Amino acid sequence: MSELSTEELIAQKQSWLTQDVSNLKVDIVFSDMDETFLHTDKSLDAKNMEMLDRLAELGIPFAPCSGRAFNVLPKEVVNHPASKYVVSCDGAIIRDLSTQTVLHESTVTKEQALELYQKLKDYPVTFDIFADGGVYLERSRHNLISQLGIPAEHAAFMQRSRTPFDQSVEEFIDSVTTIERLGSYWSVAEGEKYQALVADAVASVKGLSGTASMSMGMEILAEGTSKGAALQWLCNYLGLSTENAAAFGDSLNDVAMLSAAGMGTAVANARREDFEAAAYITLTNDEAGFSRFLTWALGE
């Protein structure tokens, strides 16, 4: 932990804003989506999309790197010519977009999912199943989303992106091929209580670990899975140095990725932990911080 105040840390890691020349070499770019590449209201930023155009022109591969399931990622980003790979479900799946094949996976077993469900089923929390590229939820828990006190924009996104099912969880889990990760959200008003209960339940299932992108939810992964591990795996697969990787993020689930990348860059709306892990801090997600840093890094 730095002894600097948050304001001092930001000032130190934004000093690049006053420098004309970067002398950096960017070979690949990774970015979180929500609260980082996207506006807070989940809309696309025109400057960030223009930067993807520039990356495509330069032949620099871009990899959206998100806690979202593949089918829930912004289509305009996934289908952009710059996007060559996708890291979805916090690093559980790495996909090559040119061939639509999964290059690497680090997934949750059906047995682990069922064991965790048994521990959480009596709590008023969601039990989100990220499987086969989609997100699924018991209908009764889907109806719970609107009652949790989650910010309206995010609650609406959750409802849109999750497909309710009417069969039992056991039957549903049996019907899918691959469980990429799990997730659980709880009431904002009782956040501390349920955060502790869910964290304890996750810790009691061998081979699972939890990370968070919001204070009222937990993203549940196979142990050892992270965006950072995925970044390192993909750079190694492509024969690229992580020193020449730029990565952007804002949440706890981005810390490992920002640490792993030579040009780990936190948006100014990120958490203190991201500021600590990053080499650089850029502008906020609503100020096209992604584009602003890369404009400088690429010497544009």
Which residues does each predicted region cover?
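Mg2+-dependent phosphoryl-transfer enzymes with acidic/Ser/Thr/Gly-rich catalytic loops
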Residues: 6, 19-28, 44-45, 218-300
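Active-site metal-binding loops of divalent metal-dependent hydrolases
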Residues: 33, 68, 91, 249-251
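Short, structured coil segments at secondary-structure junctions
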Residues: 80-82, 89-90, 98, 204-206, ...
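Asp-based phosphoryl-transfer active-site loop
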Residues: 25-41, 116, 258
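Short, acidic loop-to-helix structural element flanking the phosphoryl-transfer center
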Residues: 42-58, 105-112, 165-169, 222-236, ...
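Conserved acidic, metal-coordinating active-site core of Asp-based
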Residues: 119, 123, 130-248
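Active-site phosphate-binding/coordination module
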Residues: 43-151
